[in-house]
């Protein structure tokens, strides 16, 4: 194994010190290779050394402006720092550099939601689900965006898929109930809100919505 592989293995085993040592040696061995800088940056990010991590990601980008993993890593750091505008910029750069995986599309969608741009987030979350059908959280967030844009029939379909895959997803039951309420399907709305409460008895939003619908009858 080379030093990068040794470092990644050590990092996966939780041996931060050994990983740092290996990545340092990899940088010394190949100072013009962006990969060990990215690896070291990911290590620093994992222990919340955000500023140092950004310095290493930046070094990797200086060495190779198409290093998609460096842009993606920096985007994650800015997300953790709650600087969502910078996070969005770096995730977009990762996309331009050729990265195409579900995590990137999900993170880009999430940053746009944080920036209160759910309409722009929709295609990214949809793509995240297309690339990884097991990503139920991306599917749920996509449903939330659909509901926000009053695309209620599509939201119902999406939330139904979420609860089919995860029958314990209280928020999906709640939002499905709300969507049915807006579609004036009271029986279905009450059924879904009831299921949200079954899963999470202290779900205040579901309890409140259930009460409103019952009082309106």
Regions found by a protein language model. Give the residues of each.
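Helix-start (N-cap) detector for alpha-helical repeat units in TPR-like alpha-solenoids
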Residues: 1, 34-35, 68-69, 101-103, ...
């Amino acid at each position: 194994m080379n030093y990068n592989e040794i470092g990644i293995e050590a990092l996966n085993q939780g041996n931060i010190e050994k990983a740092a040592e290996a990545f340092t040696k990899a940088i010394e061995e190949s100072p013009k290779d962006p990969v060990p800088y990215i690896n070291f940056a990911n290590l620093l990010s994992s222990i919340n050394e955000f500023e140092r991590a950004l310095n290493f990601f930046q070094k990797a980008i200086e060495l190779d402006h198409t290093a998609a993993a460096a842009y993606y890593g920096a985007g994650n750091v800015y997300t953790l720092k709650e600087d969502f505008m910078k996070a969005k910029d770096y995730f977009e750069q990762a996309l331009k550099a050729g990265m195409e995986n579900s995590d990137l599309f999900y993170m880009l969608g999430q940053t746009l939601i944080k920036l209160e741009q759910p309409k722009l987030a929709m295609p990214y979350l949809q793509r995240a689900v297309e690339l990884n059908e097991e990503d139920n959280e991306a599917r749920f967030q996509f449903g939330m965006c659909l509901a926000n844009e009053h695309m209620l029939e599509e939201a119902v379909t999406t939330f139904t898929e979420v609860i089919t895959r995860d029958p314990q997803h209280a928020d999906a039951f709640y939002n499905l109930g709300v969507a049915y309420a807006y579609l004036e399907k009271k029986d279905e709305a009450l059924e879904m809100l009831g299921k949200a409460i079954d899963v999470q008895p202290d779900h205040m939003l579901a309890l409140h919505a259930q009460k409103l619908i019952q009082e309106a009858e």
